[in-house]
Amino acid sequence: MSWPLIGAYALLAFVAIIALNVTYQFLFRLLNKTRPPLVFHWIPFIGSTIHYGMDPYGFFFSCREKYGDIFTFILLGRPTTVYLGTQGNEFILNGKLKDVNAEEVYSPLTTPVFGSDVVYDCPNSKLIEQKKFIKFGLSQTALEAHVPLIEKEVEDYLAMSPNFHGTSGEVDITAAMAEITIFTAGSALQGEEVRSKLTTEFAVLYHDLDKGFTPINFMLPWAPLPHNKKRDAAHARMRAIYIDIINKRRNAGDNVPEKLDMIGNLMQCTYKNGQPLPDKEIAHIMITLLMAGQHSSSSISSWIMLRLASQPAVVEELYQEQLANLERTGPNNSLAPLQYKDFDNLPLHQNVIRETLRLNSSIHSLMRKVKNPLPVPGTPYVIPTSHVLLSAPGVTALSDEYFPNAMAWDPHRWETQAPKENDKDDIVDYGYGAISKGTSSPYLPFGAGRHRCIGEKFAYLNLAVIVATMVRHLRFSNLDGQTGVPATDYSSLFSGPMKPARIRWERRAAKSG
């Protein structure tokens, strides 16, 4: 058989497949009574993957106009049912363990990076205990102790980094904030031993581990691809480093002072069954904290600086807020070092963070595997076990229905639109302390339900100290000819600004203004 003939048959087969797919969708729409509407697509398996992957929020909003808040699309061959709005967030993120499962969705991707027996590679009951261990490592006392550590890291970086050499210049702020946030998290959470390695071997290991979050790994997490081989080698080496740190601390015994960092906390933890937290699991939890927290902190801090550069007047408002509300007991009547209590007197700082999180959350989709057929209250729909559920809390955060002129960055909106206060019915204890379910709110930057981020307080504190410190020392503005902020890059599992994202900076003549 000649190649032209083979090509002709292949083309005919392709056309036939598309025709059958379109026919199936037509019949599905005509005859279906209990499934959510299916988003139209030409090519089987691919479905709506490209549109969703390139612009998830554009995809969500366009589908909502056509199909309503509940619809199903094909994501790499997997029927994925989206339920938008606060009711959708409640339905998916507060689903019962027997009905929805996060582990089956995320474990293939996260386990090679984070390690075994933690997060999504263990029963939910064990994960709840691990979250409790971490939460108590983020106590009020620990958070207060973190403030001077974070401030020092930022000041040292601004003083010594080539990115901020001289009195003014330009900087790729995404690269700078990636370095700053890994240093601040390293110093505050990881301990001095890890922090001392962040500029050398750890930086390479972090980079190689980070490649494990490549989107293709949702489909092929164990494929012998070059980036996966580097990921596995980096994980093994990073685990060995943590275990070595733990062993040295144990061997030092009473000769080492009690530490407020997370490693010191985890070394004292014991499961309910009496088993001490194994060193391997301590190492894997520490890797998880480093990798998971760094992405969101790096992304959102970059967005904050880009937003401030696009509105330099807000930078000056922040600086004046510090001058008006904080002690000036430093040299030459300059601002005193930051303390935890200071941020109660800096509402605009908090609102800048809150507003940037609203517009630029780094995770646009939260998924759960359906384990039992799920009737959707108030609808005729029943979601089958072959589907994955997708919640997109960012959709309500970007909706004019909840936030007038929602696409505008306006930190002052929070002066009159405070976050919804939790009522008694919204409080739940999943096993690691009472928290808000959060799902009734249109603003969920840290997720909701049993998988809500427990590092929320540290994240806010870390960002607040970084912003306050940088505003004390620098002014920001866009480069000549640039307006607004860069577009969002959705090519990674964790979205962020398109790179490079350059802004102009200028040192203040004196801290006291």
Swiss-Prot record:
Its cofactor is heme. Pathway: Steroid biosynthesis; sterol biosynthesis. Its EC number is 1.14.14.154. The chain crosses the membrane at residues 3-23. Keywords: Heme, Iron, Lipid biosynthesis, Lipid metabolism, Membrane, Metal-binding, Monooxygenase, Oxidoreductase, Steroid biosynthesis, Steroid metabolism, Sterol biosynthesis, Sterol metabolism, Transmembrane, Transmembrane helix. It is a single-pass membrane protein. One of its GO terms (cellular component) is membrane. Gene3D superfamilies: Cytochrome P450 (1.10.630.10). It is found in: Membrane. One of its GO terms (molecular function) is iron ion binding. This is Sterol 14-alpha demethylase rstn2. It comes from Aspergillus nomiae NRRL (strain ATCC 15546 / NRRL 13137 / CBS 260.88 / M93).
